[in-house]
Design a protein with these regions (language model features):
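Hydrophobic alpha-helical transmembrane segments
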Residues: 58-67, 124-139
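Structural signal for the C-terminal ends of transmembrane alpha-helices
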Residues: 72-78, 143-149
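Interfacial segments of alpha-helical transmembrane regions
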Residues: 5-23, 73-92
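Mid-bilayer segments of alpha-helical transmembrane spans in multi-pass integral membrane proteins
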Residues: 91-103, 131-134
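Membrane-embedded alpha-helical segments of multi-pass transporters/permeases
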Residues: 31, 95-99, 136-143
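C-terminal transmembrane bundle of multi-pass solute transporters/carriers
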Residues: 39-41, 50, 59, 74, ...
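Short, charged juxtamembrane terminal tails flanking transmembrane helices
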Residues: 2-3, 147-152
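Interfacial loop at the N-terminal end of multi-pass membrane proteins
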Residues: 2-68, 103, 109-117, 121
């Protein structure tokens, strides 16, 4: 194995690690921290909504950064079609959330914080479904990236 081959293998390993880091951040915030705050009996709904707005705003910025880094590294190491497909799905979900869904959820949360009762809307359920889709895409991409290393 040449030095160049070792360097590419290292970058491919870094790609798998970066993808799984992104998945871990997503699990930690969306699937652990966010639901836990709504189980805190001393936290009122408006306060929990305000914390959630901040929490998911920061998560979205972190995910945009992770998506850019991951896609840039993938462009360099050329990981294969299935990994590209999975990363594309994850990045598309982040874009849809940032540009469309989070602003809708933010406006809804603000109305609840102000004491209003907004009409029922499917946005939160859609957000959860997209989080699950994104997580599955990242886990598939990470597994494939690391499997490809093992296969040579």
């Amino acid at each position: 194995m040449t030095t160049s081959d070792r360097g590419l293998a290292t970058l491919r390993c870094a790609l798998g690690a970066l993808i799984l880091l992104w998945a871990g951040v997503l699990i930690g915030v969306s699937f652990l921290a966010a639901p836990a705050k709504f189980n805190a009996p001393s936290l009122s709904l408006p306060v929990a909504m305000d914390v959630g707005r901040q929490e998911f705003g920061v998560l979205n910025l972190v995910e945009i950064g992770l998506a850019i880094l991951t896609l840039a590294l993938a462009a360099y190491v050329r990981p294969g079609r299935l990994i590209w497909l999975a990363l594309g799905i994850a990045a598309l979900v982040v874009a849809v959330q940032a540009l469309w869904l989070l602003p809708l959820l933010d406006a809804r949360a603000l109305s609840i914080i102000e004491g209003e009762t907004p009409p029922a809307a499917p946005w939160h359920a859609l957000y959860i479904m997209l989080e699950v889709l994104k997580l599955l895409a990242l886990l598939v991409a990470g597994w494939l990236a690391l499997w490809r290393l093992r296969a040579g």
